[in-house]
Amino acid sequence: MLSSRWWPSSWGILGLGPRSPPRGSQLCALYAFTYTGADGQQVSLAEGDRFLLLRKTNSDWWLARRLEAPSTSRPIFVPAAYMIEESIPSQSPTTVIPGQLLWTPGPKLFHGSLEELSQALPSRAQASSEQPPPLPRKMCRSVSTDNLSPSLLKPFQEGPSGRSLSQEDLPSEASASTAGPQPLMSEPPVYCNLVDLRRCPRSPPPGPACPLLQRLDAWEQHLDPNSGRCFYINSLTGCKSWKPPRRSRSETNPGSMEGTQTLKRNNDVLQPQAKGFRSDTGTPEPLDPQGSLSLSQRTSQLDPPALQAPRPLPQLLDDPHEVEKSGLLNMTKIAQGGRKLRKNWGPSWVVLTGNSLVFYREPPPTAPSSGWGPAGSRPESSVDLRGAALAHGRHLSSRRNVLHIRTIPGHEFLLQSDHETELRAWHRALRTVIERLVRWVEARREAPTGRDQGSGDRENPLELRLSGSGPAELSAGEDEEEESELVSKPLLRLSSRRSSIRGPEGTEQNRVRNKLKRLIAKRPPLQSLQERGLLRDQVFGCQLESLCQREGDTVPSFLRLCIAAVDKRGLDVDGIYRVSGNLAVVQKLRFLVDRERAVTSDGRYVFPEQPGQEGRLDLDSTEWDDIHVVTGALKLFLRELPQPLVPPLLLPHFRAALALSESEQCLSQIQELIGSMPKPNHDTLRYLLEHLCRVIAHSDKNRMTPHNLGIVFGPTLFRPEQETSDPAAHALYPGQLVQLMLTNFTSLFP
C-alpha cells in the first residue's frame, strides 16, 4: 500500500537530505496552533502569521522567528506540517551541475499525494520557467498516465512480469533512469501529507440545516456547501463530527480500505501478469478491465494539533449487550456450589443484560446515565442465566413477592420486591431471557457442524448442553450426531492447534475432547439426582422440615445424639455450652455427619467413604471425649439452619408479648405463638428447652443459670431474617425470651 509521506531513504535518493534552509526563507502559517514549550510558556500561532526560517531542526519542528520581532528576540519552534515555506523574490536561480540531480532555489511546493506530484512533474521539464505552478486546490481521485510526462514513464520498462512500486520507489526509479542533465526547478519541493492538513477541521461542523445525504442508524450525513465537506450529526444526542461514525464490529476485508485512491497506468507502461500481481501480504491485487494495475492508498486522518503518527489497525469491538431490565431489589444468596448459606438480605441494584444478571451494592443516582449501574462503581457479583431455573420462592422465605433462581453450578439466589407488579415484571423479563438462551442452545445443536465464520478455534461456552431440569438421556442417534458436532467444535484446547489438526496425536486429542464433552453433556444436574434419591441433602445447613421428613421423625437424630451425650457426661462440667470446643475437631465431626459431601474453599466436593455415617456415630468414643466439641457441634447445627428454629415471621409477635406488663397475658400469648409453629420446629424447640432445664438443675456445679443459657441460645433461636443495623438492640430481647421459656417451661409446654 502506498504512503503519502516521503521517508528518509527517498530523501537521500533524490538528494533532498536535511540541509540548512536557503537564506531569506520565510514561513507562513496555514492553520492556528497552540502548544506549551519546555519552559512552561504557551506559544500561539494564528493563521497567516509569517516567520523567518532559521533552521530545520527535524522533519516535524523548525526553528523560526517572527518577522516583526527584533533580531535579538528569542526564536520559537513551529510545526513543519502547519507551515508553508516561501522565499524572497530577489533570490536568483542557481546553475545546474551536470551529472547531479539538484533543483534551483525557488518557492517550495507541497505535494500531498502521488497525484499532485504527477501534476507538478511536467513543470520540471521546462528549463525556462522560474516560478513553480500554483498549488492544486483539490485532489483528483484518479489520474490517468496519459497526463504524466514521458520522463516519468521511462523508468517503467516492459518485461515478462511487472512488480509493485511503492510511492518511495517511484521517484527513485524516475531519477535513476534519467540520462543527462535535466531542467530543474528553482527550489526543491517539500513533500508532506497535505491531504491530512486539509482534512483537519478549522471550525466545528455547521448546523443540521444542510441537506441530508444519507442516514446510518442514528447518524445523519450532511454536506457543507461552504467547504464542500461532509459532516455527521447524531439525531439522538445532537453530537456533530467531521469524522464518520465508527462501527463497533467491522465485517469488511482489511484489504479493502476506505478512502482509496487509484493511479491507472496504460498497458504500454506496465505489463501485469495474466492473473494479477501478488502483494507483500500474499493476496493477489485486482486489475481493472483494461489490464492496468490499481495502487491503493489509504488516507489517514489527524486530530489537530496532533502530528502525523502511525495508527494501529482497527480492532473488532464487541457489541454492547442491551439492558433488558434494571431496578432496585432485595437480594440474598442461599446456596454456593450446592452448599446452603445463611440468608443475608440487603438492597441491591440489579441489571439484566445479555445472559447475565449483575448485582451492584449501591443504587444509582436519581438520573443514571445508563442501565448498567451506578457510575464509577463495580458490580458486586453476577449470575450466568444459561441453563438457570426460575421459580417462586414462597417456601424458601417468609417474605412476600420472592423469586428463586437456581444456576447450573449450584448457586441459588432470592430476589424480593415490596411491589407485586414490579416482581411480576422481573419474572417475565427473566423468563424471557432464559427461554431465549435455551432456544439458542437448541438451535446451535441442530445447526450444521461446520465451523462458524470468524470464530476460529475459540470455544463458545454456549455449545455445552445447559439444562436445568432432568437428566440428559441421549439416544444412539443423538450420540452419533453429537459426536460429529464435537469433532468440528472441540471442547478443550490441548497443547497447540496444529497438533490437534494433523497427525495421530491430533486424532487422539480429538477423541479425548469428544469423550469429555459427551460426559459433560450427559451429566445430570444436581436437582435431578436429589429428586431420584441418588444424592441426599446434608445434615448441616439442611431445611429442618425436609431433614425431619427424610428421617421420619420430628426431631433431628443428630440433635438427639448430642443431647444424649451431654446428659450422660456433661451436666456437671463447668461452663457447659458457654465454653467453645476445638473448631478443627468440630468440623471433623460435622464432616462425618454430613450425608452428601463437604465443599472445600475452592469449590471442590469431598465425599465421605460411606453415606449416612451419623447412624453409626458413637459420641462416647475417645475421639469425642471433650464434651465441649459435642456442644459446639450442637450449636453449629442450630446456626447452620437456613431458617432459624423460631420462624422469623413470629419474632415481632414474640417481642410484643414480651413487652406486656401482665405476666399471665404474656405467657398466654407466647404459648399461642409456640403452638402456631410448624410441628418439627415445635418439637425440636421443646426437646432442646427440656434438655436445658436439666442443665439448669445442675447450675450449682456448672454455673449455667437461665440468664447464661439465654445469652448463649437467644441470638441463635430467635435469629432475624435480615441483619439489623444495631446488633446490640437485637441481642437483648432474645435472651430474655429464652430465659422466660426456661423459667416457665412447664406452663408453656404442658
From Swiss-Prot:
The keyword Ribosomal protein does not apply. The modification Phosphoserine is found at residues 475, 500. Residues 22-88 form the SH3 domain. GO terms for cellular component: cytoplasm; cytosol; extracellular region; plasma membrane; secretory granule lumen. Keywords: GTPase activation, Lipid-binding, Phosphoprotein, SH3 domain. Residues 163-180, 251-270, 291-300 have a biased composition (Polar residues). The record marks 578 as: Arginine finger. GO terms for molecular function: GTPase activator activity; phosphatidylinositol-3,4,5-trisphosphate binding. InterPro entries: ARHGAP9_SH3, PH-like_dom_sf, PH_domain, Rho-GAP, Rho_GTPase_activation_prot, RhoGAP_dom, SH3-like_dom_sf, SH3_domain. Pfam families: PH, RhoGAP, SH3_1. Residues 301-317 have a biased composition (Low complexity). GTPase activator for the Rho-type GTPases by converting them to an inactive GDP-bound state. Has a substantial GAP activity toward CDC42 and RAC1 and less toward RHOA. Has a role in regulating adhesion of hematopoietic cells to the extracellular matrix. Binds phosphoinositides, and has the highest affinity for phosphatidylinositol 3,4,5-trisphosphate, followed by phosphatidylinositol 3,4-bisphosphate and phosphatidylinositol 4,5-bisphosphate. This is Rho GTPase-activating protein 9. The gene is ARHGAP9.
